[in-house]
Design a protein with these regions (language model features):
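Long, hydrophobic alpha-helical segments
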Residues: 1-8
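Helix-loop-helix units of permease transmembrane domains in multi-pass membrane transporters
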Residues: 8-39
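Alpha-helical transmembrane segments and their short interhelical loops
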Residues: 28-29, 33-104, 163-186
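Transmembrane helix segments
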Residues: 90-137
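Short, membrane-exposed interhelical loops at transmembrane-helix boundaries
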Residues: 137-166
Length: 194
């Protein structure tokens, strides 16, 4: 869902609705983007909670209070990062066809080149390196750890080819990625919204 966050903005841009918003007497034009980020984040977290609740009812377990907090923080960071990327692409690319193409080209490789479907130890060396550098892996491993038992963020969650990665490191990497993406798209948003 967050990877598609830029599509509504792109359609608003193409059909002229965004121009109408830009001439409205808003206190801050960045509130247009902020509203989109808040909406996508809330929707993604609700969908995730619904999936987690359904999994718990079906007998797959519940992460507990501290585990739930870790899952929500991890999802929040991931959703913010992917939403920032999608919104940046929505303002950088000329039309929705290009945006949809980028989304489709990025979506499945991000999933398959991560630890979502198989642990690193099952992967060939080259794929293990890709998965160990994939931001999605840094979100999957803390969530997996939250479901596996007692929560310890200092424990090694990922035995990457370049070294061991702890739960705290995963969250810090996601935080740096999120902040970096928002800082990277900020000049573009300022230019396009002014």
């Amino acid at each position: 869902m967050p990877l598609n966050a830029g599509l509504p903005v792109m359609f608003d841009r193409e059909f002229g609705f965004l121009n109408r918003l830009l001439v409205a007497p808003l206190r801050s034009r960045s509130s247009i983007v902020l509203a989109s980020v808040i909406y996508i984040t809330a929707l993604s977290l609700l969908q995730s909670l619904a999936i987690m609740g359904t999994a718990a009812v079906l007998g797959y377990g519940w992460p507990g209070i501290s585990g739930l907090a870790l899952v929500l923080v991890t999802l929040l960071l991931l959703v913010f990062a992917v939403t920032a990327l999608s919104l940046g692409l929505a303002f950088a690319l000329p039309g929705h066809i290009e945006l949809i193409a980028v989304i489709f080209v990025a979506n499945l490789p991000l999933l398959f080149a991560s630890t979502a479907l198989a642990p690193l130890s099952f992967m060939p060396t080259w794929l293990g390196w890709l998965a160990a550098l994939n931001p999605l892996t840094f979100a999957i491993e803390p969530i997996r750890a939250a479901y596996q038992g007692p929560l310890d963020l200092s424990a090694v969650l990922l035995e990457a080819p370049y070294g061991d990665v702890t739960g705290t490191s995963c969250l810090l990497i996601l935080l740096v990625l999120t902040i970096g993406l928002f800082l990277a798209i900020r000049p573009l948003l300022n230019r396009k919204l002014s």
